[in-house]
Amino acid sequence: MAQIPSLENAPLNLKSIRDKSERELVNLLKDVRGTKCLVIDPKLSGSVSLIIPTSKLKELGLELRHLTAEPVQTECTKVVYLVRSQLSFMKFIASHIQNDIAKAIQRDYYVYFVPRRSVACEKILEQEKVHNLVTVKEFPLYMVPLDEDVISFELELSEKDCLVDGDVSSLWHIAKAIHELEFSFGVISKMRAKGKASVRVADILNRMQVEEPVNSNDVGRPEVDTLILLDREVDMVTPMCSQLTYEGLIDEILHISNGAVEVDSSVMGAQQEGKKMKVPLNSSDKLFKETRDLNFEVVVQVLRQKAMTMKEDYTEINSTQTVSELKDFVKKLNSLPEMTRHIHLAQHLTTFTSKQSFNSQLDMEQTLVEAENYDICYEYIEEMIHKQEPLTNVLRLLVLFSVTNSGLPKKQFDYIRMELLHSYGFEHVVTLNNLEKAGLLKKQEFKSNWLTVKRTLKLIVEDTDTSRPNDIAYVYSGYAPLSIRLIQQAIHSGWRPMEDILKLLPGPHLETKRSGFPSSPSVDSLHGASNGVADGRRSIVLVVFIGGVTFAEISALRYLASKEGMAYDLIVATTKIVNGATLIETFMEKLG
């Protein structure tokens, strides 16, 4: 099965975005004549594989390597480095070149920065006396389509950069990516933003349109009506909760990276243990497309039912008479590999979800979100520390405690901090400082407003029917993600009716019509359902998460888009797909 999703059914022509990036990269590589070795920054290789298959790169006559501190072992006379603007990488590249010079190896060197070159990086190449030996260019990859309705800006550290380091360069990158979309699909005339970073991106985007305007005559009628920008900081509760959709749970337990998950081959039914295999997970897999957004409990039932149906079909094949019936049966057999793959995956997930520890964790999360009994949760977290459970698991629950309670009482905060450092090592003091600076794990200074937010936005939905959901709360089995409730309101009635609630959440908010820009016919009808655009397609809302989005939140948005009376298709763009663990890990640092 193709690792790259086809994108054929995307509400926007995301394939054109992907094809453009592929062409740009191929042209850059073709500009370098002769035998060449492409040395890729390891974090970029996944993004590049979603733009152009490795097989296509090899067809260009390339050797492929990952960038490390070790010298590049190749006979090629041209070495092309494809890297993000990271200072440590410049040291690696300089040492590679110096190593070649010491061995009297003559090569041509090219450094392609993604998405743009950096003065600080080039300064290091100058200091290392290799800048004059290098041809520097840019590969402007600002976004990668992950699937038919999901775009990633591939900025995994943006949340820490903004909240801890005060580095807001990622916000320019986000605005640039959105502006690039506008050059393809027209200027987005309505904007709603919530959070410091989001309001800043909206401002940068407006300035970009003034400095480098999109010509409406070139792109025709705008395809995207509305842009909703949301800071992750506005809702840190949701990612700290365990996702209970199929795709979300796979990410929680196995970690999905660039649209695929890597598992031991024995998980997928192979005899050989210890060998890893990649399982692609995207909309090209019809069964995955059907099940990815369902609550995991339901997925198990769906797979069981499909397996039973296939078994019945198989027993009936003996009495099959007509060619047409045979043809139908063979068609069903074609879906067997998909079925087998997902039965194996679901079986593997069940070994985790059936554990007492998994259910205890869910109980604690529910208790914290419902703000019922903080004492029980505090004792549970203490016990986790004494049992030396993984630090990310402990911090995840602590952050959930802190965010729903506006911090920990001073005595508890000091005690738990000391316990963490004693149990896990004093090198984690930097991690705790980062979380405190980001406002995620702090001392309580005032009473929490979580109860008001929870009650007003109906975040707890009793008796959630996961098999026939009538609310987005099914994705967390009873908790409706705060982020998606806000987006729900923004789509249907804008920010104005919920001003009081928005003031209780972090950061400013903004609602603006970008005057002077032509809009599509339905742009003024955000208050309720519109009739879509003239050619029968639905209007599009672009939802941008700054700081990351979870798969469960994406599932909740897909659920909203599928509801009767919903006049919009939703496209999600994000700095990175995250879960509680991966988000916590971005704040984790060790000394030395």
UniProtKB/Swiss-Prot annotation:
Protein origin, superkingdom: Eukaryota
Modification N-acetylalanine occurs at: A2
Keywords for this protein: Acetylation, Membrane, Vacuole
Keyword Oxidoreductase found: no
GO biological process, one term: vesicle-mediated transport
PANTHER family: VESICLE PROTEIN SORTING-ASSOCIATED
Name used for this protein in its record: Vacuolar protein-sorting-associated protein 33 homolog
Designated gene of the protein: VPS33
